[in-house]
Every structure is written in C-alpha cells, then in structure tokens.
Amino acid sequence: QTCALPICVSGGALNLASGIMAVLAAPLSVLVSVPGMFIIGIFASLLWCFGIHGTMIVYPVLMPMMMTALAENAAHAAAGEPLVFYPVALFTALQCCGGTGNTLPLALFGLRSKSKQIQAVAKVSAVPGWFGINEPMTFGMPIMFNPILCIPYVLNIPLVMLCYYIGYQTGFIIPAWIPIMSLMPMGFAQYLGTLNWTNAIWDYIMLIPTGLVWYPFFKIYEKQLVAKEAAAAQNEA
C-alpha cells in the first residue's frame, strides 16, 4: 500500500477512506494520553456534528491500543496483580450513556416533551439508546447540523471523561480486562468486562452529569419546535 495525500493505493485501487485514515493515524496516535484522549473525544464528536462518523475515524487508530491494554490487564488479573489504568480507557466515555455523544438523557427528556416531533423521535430512540444505538436520535432529532444540540453533544464528552478519570483514580471503577465486543444494555458490558459491580452502575451515575449538560439545550430546542408546530397548526386551521 502506498499513499499520496489524501489517496491510498491498495492492491492497485484508489481508496479515499484509507487515505483519510493514513493522514489522521500519525497525529492521533501521538495523542494517546489523558489530555490527548480529551482532544480525540472532542474531535470525534465534532466530526459527527458535520455528518462524518467521527467514532469510526478515530477507532481504527485506538483499537490496537485498546486491545493491548486489555491483554496486559488480563495478564495482571491472572497473576493476581493490580490492574493498570491506560488513558485509552477514557474513550468509552464517548458513548457510555446511549451511544456516541451520550444521547440517552436527551431521549428520556424527549419522552415527555411538549413538541410532537421530539416526542416521536424519543419514543423510537429510548430503547435502542439503552443498548448504545443512537442513530435514530442522531439523525431523527436531528443532532447533526443542529447548532443547538451539537453544543451539548460535544461538551458532555470532556465532562464525562473527567468523571471517568476521577473514577479510575479513586478506584471506584477499574480498567476492563475482558474484551466484550457485542452491543449490550448499559452496565452489562461494563460488568462482564471487569467483573466489578461498581463498573456496572457507573454509566447510570453518568446519566446525571450528561443530563445536566443536555437539559438546557433540550429546552431551547423544544421551545423552537413547539413554536413552529403551533404556527403550522394555526396555518392549517
């Protein structure tokens, strides 16, 4: 494989996606530290706001580091040694509460919204969000290309990463050492990956800070949609 900005030639074929990965891989790999993970989290969520799958852009770079951290901690666990915190573990904060951007609080608020549009989207988003699937919310609300909702979508990432970091440093939660790759309801994968019950409840605790970030922006957006829906109903009458 040879690369010339930003196209990669792989097996004789041009591959734009591989070119983008190659361009981003070097700077992203340097950022695997605690401050660097904050930058990567914000970067990935910002890409989502512009319609680019930010998680998948950074994931190929971080995945080998995640697997290395899991393998090393599995060895520590087998030897009865203390588990080691690796900054790459903070990446899970990107999607701990309902998928990338931690949108489950937004779906829960929407279930009782005065806006018919928000309520309709929330009804089809809440259960998938519990499983970490938030495409219905991201595309249906929508969050992408929506300045009001993009702000909390990005802001909650560093906040939750900070909470995670404090949780790891205080020992309330422990690093994962068992790889769990399937989608599961909140708390299930966290328990199975650590066999630690406090990890299982941690993401539910994170609903509080993420909800505090989402709520004021939710109310602003709700007010706008309620006004539009009222105007549309008046015009139809």
Give the ranges of each region predicted by the language model.
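Generic multipass alpha-helical transmembrane bundles of integral membrane proteins
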Residues: 6-113
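Transmembrane alpha-helical segments and their short flanking loops
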Residues: 71-84, 105-107, 138-237
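Alpha-helical transmembrane segments of multi-pass membrane proteins, especially transporters
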Residues: 59, 63, 90-95, 124-128, ...
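Hydrophobic, aromatic-rich alpha-helical transmembrane segments
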Residues: 30, 34, 38, 87, ...
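Juxtamembrane helix-loop transition segments at the membrane interface in multi-pass membrane proteins
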Residues: 116-121, 226, 230
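Short, small-residue-biased leader/transition segments that mark boundaries at the very start
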Residues: 1-5
